[in-house]
Design a protein with these regions (language model features):
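Primarily NTPase-proximal linker/entry elements flanking Walker-type ATP/GTP-binding cores
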Residues: 1-145
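Conserved catalytic-core segment of NTP-binding enzymes
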Residues: 121-135, 148-190
Length: 190
């Protein structure tokens, strides 16, 4: 991705007319490549034919998964759905508490049977959260998973185990724009 942009930018800047805006040329090249990489069409979240729709959030620590979980749940609630948040990030200190605060602020219930801070089994929490959602007739389940400061074998295995256990209808990869060039490598790893 980056090397492709670099080649195009060098070629465009070589052919640049006097007085043209170099920054604008580079911006247009990056924009074109991002649209090609990510797709030009907006796509709605894939909803399950039979409720609940299960959405798993994945990504590195600090990327905004927990915040997105709350915003996504609020979006669905505003549409008339009955979302629930599932606290499967049991590694990061106070991650469960953070999701509970986000849920409370958004008016969304949170399934959090474990205190987190390294205690509990995230796969079992995800599985139990879906069972709870079915029993309480929630039609959208958003599973907030753990991140790490970087991609590692433990993180990838945990994400895979949760995915295999809950068979989500959607897996949303959350990345912070500040991740920069590493975002592509991280997305490929996930």
């Amino acid at each position: 991705f980056v090397s492709k942009i670099e080649v195009q930018a060098k070629a465009a800047l070589t052919d640049l007319q006097a007085g043209a805006n170099q920054a604008q040329v580079i911006f247009e090249i990056v924009n074109k490549e991002l649209v090609e990489l990510l797709g030009s069409q907006a796509r709605r979240v894939r909803l399950a034919k039979v409720a609940p729709t299960v959405i798993m959030l994945a990504g590195l620590q600090g990327a905004g998964k927990t915040t997105l979980a709350g915003k996504l749940a609020k979006y669905f609630a505003d549409l008339g759905d009955t979302p629930i948040l599932v606290a499967s990030d049991l590694q990061r200190p106070n991650a469960v508490t953070q999701l509970q605060v986000v849920g409370q602020n958004a008016g969304i219930p949170v399934f959090a049977p474990e205190p987190g801070n390294g205690v509990g089994n995230p796969v079992e929490v995800a599985r139990a959260g879906i069972a709870f959602a079915k029993a309480k007739l929630h039609n959208i389940v958003i599973v907030d998973t753990a991140g790490r400061l970087g991609v590692d074998a433990e993180l990838m295995q945990e994400a895979k185990n949760i995915r295999d256990a809950i068979s989500p209808d959607e897996i949303l990869f959350v990345v912070d724009a500040m991740t920069g060039q590493d975002a592509v490598r991280t997305a490929q790893a996930f």
